[in-house]
């Protein structure tokens, strides 16, 4: 019998850029996130799907989402639970606004040390920045 696993999926809420309107950009040339609806990062949905498949293979396993963002980022935790996740963790504080990938990775790593998962799954990259750095930085 396989040991039950505590699986955590790193996920991000990103702006939905499929239907960008005239207010999508700020005068400074950055994305006006308030003007765009927010969605579950598609690459992270792939990670969630993989985690849920692993959960199904190993009796007693759990899947939780870990995300960092404003309070509305809790929407992707609810979405993940609708898809089969057992719960989630939201790191939220105004001080996190504008965090770069290193700061984000550090905050997520601190949370992971407290959560103590057996397996961590991350998507390839977020569609809003395309840096593909948070997963590898958390892995270090």
Predicted features and spans:
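N-terminal glycine-rich FAD/FM-binding segment characteristic of electron-transfer flavoproteins
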Residues: 1-140
């Amino acid at each position: 019998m396989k040991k039950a696993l505590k699986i955590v999926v790193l996920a991000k809420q990103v702006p939905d850029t499929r239907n960008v309107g005239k207010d999508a950009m700020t005068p400074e040339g950055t994305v006006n996130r308030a003007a765009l609806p927010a969605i579950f990062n598609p690459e992270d949905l792939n990670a969630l799907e993989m985690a849920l498949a692993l959960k199904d293979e190993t009796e007693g396993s759990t899947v939780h989402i870990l995300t960092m963002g404003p309070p509305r980022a809790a929407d992707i935790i609810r979405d993940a639970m609708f898809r089969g996740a057992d719960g989630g963790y939201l790191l939220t504080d105004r001080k996190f606004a504008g965090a770069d990938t290193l700061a984000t990775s550090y905050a997520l790593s601190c949370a992971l040390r407290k959560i103590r998962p057996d397996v961590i799954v991350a998507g390839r990259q977020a569609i809003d920045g395309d840096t593909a750095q948070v997963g590898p930085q958390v892995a270090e």
